[in-house]
Amino acid sequence: MTQLEAIAFDDRGVPLTGWLAQPEGEPRAAVLVFPTIANVTPAIERRAQMLVDRGYLAFIGDFYGEPVPDFAAAQRLAAALRGDVDHYRTRLEANLNTMRNLSAATGLQLAAIGFCMGGQAVLELARAGKELAAVVSFHGLLDTGRPARAPVHPRILVCHGDQDPMVPREQVMAFWQEMDAAEAHWHFHAYSGVKHGFTDPASDSRGLAAVGYDASADRQSWAAMNNLFDELF
C-alpha cells in the first residue's frame, strides 16, 4: 500500500487537506480524485491506490476542510458548498491548482475523476473551462447551476447507473444536450438496472434504496476510464 502524504492548502482562508499518493518512477499523469459527499473515505483511498498501481500520481481532494461525522452532516456541508456556483467552483479550483503546483506534478498532463458528488465536481471543472486532458464521473450528479459553454477542453467520460433516482433520464437528456451545445468531446456509459453508488461495495450496507453496489458496472466503468487514459497518457 502506497503511503498517503497530507498536503495542506486553503481556499479563501478555509484550511483544507489533500492526500498525495505517488507511484515508483515517473508518473504517467497527475489525477485529481474527488470523493463522495462523505469526503475522504477508505473507498476513495483505495481508488487512489488503484491509480498509483497503473503509474499515475493521485491527489485526493478535500471538499469541506472539516470532519464528516455522519450523513446528515455531509448533506449540510454539501448543501452549503454547492448552493452558490461561484463558491463551489472556486473550492474545486483550489484543489486542482494545489495538485497542479505540486513539484511532483511538474510537466505532467492533468486529469480528474470523481464519485457521486465528486462526479459532479469534475464536470463542473470541465464546464468552467479548466484545461484538463480528461474528466471521469462515476455515478455523478449531472445537473448544474451554470451550463457549459465552448470551449470545453477535457475529454469527458460519464459512467452512470440507469436506475439512479438522483439522476433521472430527463437530467441525462439535458446533460447530452448541454454537452452538444458546448461542442464537448463526451462519452456516456449507462448501465441498466444499476443504482447510485455502484462502485462502492459498502453501498449495500447503507440501508438506502437509492444506492447499491454492482460488481459488473464497477469493473466496466473502471475499465472504461483505463481505456480512455491509455489513449491519452
Regions found by a protein language model. Name each.
Residues 4-105, 199-214:
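Serine-hydrolase catalytic machinery in alpha/beta-hydrolase-like enzymes
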Residues 103-115:
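Alpha/beta-hydrolase fold nucleophile elbow
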Residues 114-118, 122:
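Gly/Ala-rich beta-loop-alpha elbow adjacent to hydrolase catalytic centers
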Residues 131-141:
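A conserved short beta-strand
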Residues 158-160, 164, 191:
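Short beta-strand/loop motif that positions the catalytic acidic residue
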Residues 163-168, 196:
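Acidic catalytic loop of the alpha/beta-hydrolase fold
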Residues 168-178:
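Short alpha-helix in the alpha/beta-hydrolase fold that links the catalytic acid
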Residues 180, 185-233:
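C-terminal catalytic histidine-bearing segment of alpha/beta-hydrolase fold enzymes
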